[in-house]
Amino acid sequence: MFDAGDRGGGGGVVAVKRMKLCEEEEEEEEGMEVDEEEEEVGWVWRPPGGLAGEDEAAAWEGRAAAIVVSDAVEVDFPVIYVNAAFEAATGYRADEVLGRNCRFLQFRDPRAQRRHPLVDPMVVSEIRRCLNEGIEFQGELLNFRKDGAPLYNRLRLIPMHGDDGFVTHVIGIQLFSEANIDLSNVSYPVYKQQSNHRPNIQEINPASHEHIPKIQSSEYCCILQLSDEVLAHNILSRLSPRDVASIGSVCTRMHELTKNDHLRKMVCQNAWGRDVTVRLEMSTKMLGWGRLARELTTLEAASWRKFTVGGRVEPSRCNFSACAVGNRLVLFGGEGVNMQPMDDTFVLNLESAKPEWRRVKVSASPPGRWGHTLSWLNGSWLVVFGGCGQQGLLNDVFVLDLDAKQPTWREVASEGPPLPRSWHSSCTLDGSKLVVSGGCTESGVLLSDTFLLDLTKEKPAWKEIPTSWSPPSRLGHTLSVFGKTKLFMFGGLAKSGSLRLRSCDAYTMDAGEDSPQWRQLATTGFPSIGPPPRLDHVAVSLPCGRIIIFGGSIAGLHSPSQLFLLDPAEEKPTWRILNVPGQPPKFAWGHSTCVVGGTRVLVLGGHTGEEWILNELHELCLASRPDEDE
């Protein structure tokens, strides 16, 4: 829960919004329409994940939303306002509710001491987590009227911030509907958190233990006496997805707990990070967290497919750079005819019924370039760095908000920039910090430095990450993020004495440490099982922290489409080969490959001679597509 300390300063803002709520309620009762300005305040209900179709939309249309306001400054979020729709839906009068926490709706009887066993503890835990973090919650929860009748509550909790940035109030928007459920059908017993009764195994699951002699209570596993909420929120959610799946086979109760999708989401969120799970939720939609965690862990559903898209990227080009923004692919720049640097931007919306390339009309563009990097930042922002322009190599930084009404490339004035370069590698940390590594200078010298630029600063300044040792200078390598703050470098054309050779070495650095250091990974595996030396290849960072390597420029007869998997966090990292069915691309290059939503790897086209075919895409699907089950 939020700290109940002194957080004054925001009450006036929320008080005005509470008055707006009251005014809107009175207008509704009098049959008056609310104008557009008042509708934009944000009190319109939108179900989690959107409505499934017109029938469902019609079912909810016109239903009055129950509104509750709680004080986040006081202990336990006491209710300070309810509207008439709440009173009508729940049977509780306002004077019976004000000053209490809204959890009483989880009790079937007003005199009950704890919530009903059919109330999903994982949803309750998710609500608590969102309140603790001051973020919005959307979900469905079983509630009860004052007379004990069950209701489904489609709930949306919106935190309101004061002028000082602290959460001062929480708005609850609720849509209640009748729940036709058997309240006596409890799939597993839920014990009180404080209980002197120690049940034996027969009492836990009598049907499956009819012929087993009674076991003394002293031999009963104490952990099973914990409440479902404690087991889910404090223990199971902190384990890895693989461990949770294993625990689900222990007994019936654990099976029921671990198959819950809210728990699975908490497990994935704690293991992979909130930003990753948000992207996965947007891209995989109704796949389910249990199935998604299994498929991303085992890669059992991985497959290649080929498809075509419309539109054209003209003039034709090579050596461009591409990245993904949500479910959109963005392409910038490239090398045209007679080594002409290009400065245009194209986008491909994969959510469209018929995806096609279209040129983005921008009011200003960076100087044309090729051999640069294009990286995704938070939201709909992109960042371009370096490359080879009309007048030589560059070290400038430009950002673009793809969702702006008038998209404009804006140059970021930054202090202490690194040397101008091309064929370097870059990635982003926390969606806001640009990391640049290596590359080649104007004179052809290979670089081994690593720079960081925090784009959230009012005056961004480049900072070289000082290390006591650096990997050999190189270009055409990859730089990936795993474990939130850790960097993984692989391959490239590296300096080896007086020679420049393709590399298959791997290095890691934890940028979150006080003194980050590069460390070479001592990888293991059967002879010849690791990826052959290469440059300009593809490195895919999976949500679970593992890395997939394929493609690039490889010496000899090795196949660029062969996939190699490595977990750099293992005590002894070991390369493994992935055999994936489907139609892989003949060639794949790092600058023209994008990762969409954490589960889709898009390789842009092939090429005939010098001409790239950007209407042909190969997709490596790391998880099942929801439409495959239809």
From Swiss-Prot:
Q: In which pathway does it act?
A: Protein modification; protein ubiquitination
UniProt keyword Metal-binding present:
no
Tell me the keywords, alphabetical order.
Biological rhythms, Chromophore, Flavoprotein, FMN, Kelch repeat, Nucleus, Photoreceptor protein, Receptor, Repeat, Sensory transduction, Ubl conjugation pathway
Q: Taking every annotated instance into account, which residue ranges of this chain make up the domain PAS?
A: 54-126
Where in the cell does this protein reside?
Nucleus
Q: Which Pfam families match?
A: F-box-like, Kelch_2, Kelch_KLHDC2_KLHL20_DRC7, PAS_9
Q: What is its main location?
A: nucleus
Q: Which Gene3D superfamilies match?
A: 1.20.1280.50, Kelch-type beta propeller, PAS domain
Residue span, F-box domain: 220-268
**The protein's name in its UniProt record:** Adagio-like protein 3
